[in-house]
Amino acid sequence: MGDNLNKAINYMMKRFEEVNTFFIEKVAEQIMAIGELNPTSINRIAIMTEMGTNINDITQRLAIATNTSLRDVFKIYQAALDDVYTDQRFTQALKQQSISSEAKARITQYTQSVSIQTAKTLTNLSNTTAVSESYRTAIDTAVMAVSSGMTDYQSATRDAIKQIGYNGMQVVYESGYHRRLDTAIRQNVIDGANQIAQNCSIMMGDELGYDAYELSAHARSAPDHEPIQGRVFSKADFNNIQNGLPFRDIDGTLYRAIRRPIGEWNCMHIAMSFSTQYSKRRYTDAQLKQWAADNAKGCDIEGKHYSIYEAGQLMREIETEIRRQKDVAVAAQYAGDDALRQSCQKKINSLARKYNTVAQESGITPRRDRMTVQGFKPVKVK
């Protein structure tokens, strides 16, 4: 997926991050307010009323963010389709023949279908977000701490504050599985863009009589897909890849079956239509070999050897953990828990040092934009 599409998705995701921060702030503020009460002054009805008002406000903001983002989804997916039409693999063939109006209509209809399905999924995700469940659990903990006369209120509510900040707004699936809303939305939008890129390219290729597929390629590939990325496969052999069977590329190299299909299970590769008559491979053998060699050479971090792919995965994990700790720090700030805020800052500082080390040793460009959290204010560690 291109940089422009990634930027568009990141811009859209800021809306949901803002709602998530608002959710954290509201819960934390109410926890702090409850802590100022005592067993005789606590009023459960008033607390539940305030909670209900806040939940309605959060839900409305989430609905607005979702509705606004639906327009973005259609724009993002149209851009993904436009990239297919300008793909260099089709340039020469399109000089010889044009795409029929019927084929264009099918491709457009498919793109619209994916757009509508993704829009429905985003709406469903927002509607199944457990705002009230996690909010109520945190408030119940706070009320119990005050009602029982605990002397150390902050210690009693600290775990609840941590959970609110670390988990954020959660989607609850029918299976009972929980996942952060922002993570679920981002993955669904990316999956849809990749579906359009791959399947519209295949539809174009079928219309033009293309006989093969070229797999996309990138540096720091996962080990199971690295040997085959950037290679060209007949349609029959690509089907073997997807169905877990042995396969060959068009040069005759035989490969063992792989478990993870292309474009699935968090795979960022896609298959693009390729003509052995018209198309020119996007990636040379020399480039693919260099990427593989650089990946294997890897780097040593804290006495352990990592491939560059593994180092990249480690950086993504650290980025996620720093964001989570910043969310907890925001919750601690609004709950007035300075000790928790200090603890978060120490973890953030330690993670940031490790992140810088991994980036320096691996040569991977740091992505500090992935670690920003609205409302986070660093504090000086005591």
Write out the residue ranges for each language-model feature.
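Alpha-helical structural elements
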Residues: 11, 105, 130, 148, ...
